[in-house]
Amino acid sequence: RYPALEGIMIAGYATKFAQAIDLTILSELPNLHSLSVNICEGRGYLIDFSKFRLKEFSGAWFSHYQGLESLIELEVLRLSAYKAANLEALSHMSLLHTLVLWDSHVPSLAGIERCTRLKDMDLFRVKGLTDLSPLAQHPSLERLHLLSNRHLTQVQALNTCPKLRKLCIEKCKHVADIVTLEGATEIARITLDQVQSISFLPELPKLEFVYLEDVFDC
């Protein structure tokens, strides 16, 4: 009935239905490329993503949703409430260039290294995440924003990202090896908030912009 429809956004609070609503029916729209499902309580909805051919998805992930790993044509993923041991479910998304992960529990980024076109990445309030080692030598990562990752202690992997130009680290108080960023010599813009030291900044030859707030040791 709506052959030209390319994007759908569903938002709000889910109502208690007598029977769960299966949003998988939306996959029958032939030109649907973008889907946003921002529902505060998703028990009233079902989605099987293996039926979709999306380029963009945004929303909370509930345990009864299925088929995230099937979205192999995805280019943009904004995901919250995601709970998994790692990011292996994303490893087949070879076209993915933008990833936003927030309010989730993911102890390891393993799997993201196979998303070789990834350019932009935001990690906000990701519980359990201690290091960024799967990002080591990532060939295309250009921008990374880290916010309120309370368990994060290691960022040394960023030294080997050849295209990383924009870095923001905010409220990640327990990063112990931040001085090792002196090896990330391609960085041009950096924002640091509540970090242990900025002694490495003079070692960044391409630096164009610096924003500092609540630095513990200058």
Feature locations, PLM:
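Concave beta-strand-loop units of leucine-rich repeat
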Residues: R1-S27, N31-G67, E73-E88, H92-S108, ...
